[in-house]
């Protein structure tokens, strides 16, 4: 890595592929399991759901995949924190003055995170997901990145491409939604704290 330039958030270029690791809503789901377990039970989730969700907290480091993306030639990368993967994608597009075309159906989501999203009624796209890393990768670097991630045992998905048309367009089963604001209107974890009472309150 000596002499290699750091990979910034703003380097995505038209034609790059957008890759993400692990899944959406990781940390937010784990936090809800730790801090709102009684609410989770009341909403119909089971003990095994809560225990499984807590284990997601073990995945919050992105160092292994960040090393791989950096070594293999990614043009940009961004960890998914407050505001979820939607805010991450919007920031990457805005900073690079490009657009992103994303397929929601290609985004991995742990089954337990999906169960929590349904029970707590939150949008997994806007839920904090530390442990998830998003990167833009040129076509000619793609196979090397994928091979290295596979060898490291890191779950990944190719979720879309960088375009010259500005804005983030996400394809859902119901159609395509275009997002143009830099920041989504709300953070889902913060909304959960206003809607539900934590266990120690």
Give, region by region, the residue ranges found by the protein language model.
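A generic local secondary-structure boundary/capping motif
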Residues: 3-11, 21, 66, 90, ...
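Beta-strand->loop->alpha-helix junctions that form or flank phosphate-binding loops
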Residues: 80-81, 99-108, 126-128, 146-173
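Acidic, Ser/Thr/Pro-rich beta/coil linker or hinge segments at domain junctions
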Residues: 152-201
């Amino acid at each position: 890595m000596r002499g290699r330039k750091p990979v910034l958030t703003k380097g995505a270029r038209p034609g790059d592929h957008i890759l993400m690791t692990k899944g959406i809503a990781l940390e937010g789901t784990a936090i809800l399991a730790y801090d709102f377990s009684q609410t989770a039970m009341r909403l119909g989730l089971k003990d095994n759901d809560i225990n499984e969700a807590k284990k997601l907290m073990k995945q919050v480091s992105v160092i292994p995949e960040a090393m791989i993306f950096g070594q293999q030639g990614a043009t940009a990368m961004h960890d998914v924190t407050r505001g979820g993967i939607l805010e991450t994608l919007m920031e990457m597009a805005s900073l690079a003055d490009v657009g992103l075309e994303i397929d929601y159906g290609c985004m991995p989501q742990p089954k337990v995170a999906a169960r929590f999203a349904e029970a707590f009624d939150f949008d997994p796209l806007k839920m904090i997901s530390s442990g998830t890393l998003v990167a833009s990768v040129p076509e000619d670097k793609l196979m090397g990145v994928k091979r290295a991630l596979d060898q490291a045992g890191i779950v990944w998905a190719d979720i879309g491409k960088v375009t010259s048309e500005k804005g983030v367009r996400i394809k859902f089963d119901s159609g395509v939604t275009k997002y143009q604001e830099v920041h989504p209107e709300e953070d889902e974890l913060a909304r959960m704290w206003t809607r539900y009472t934590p266990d120690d309150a």
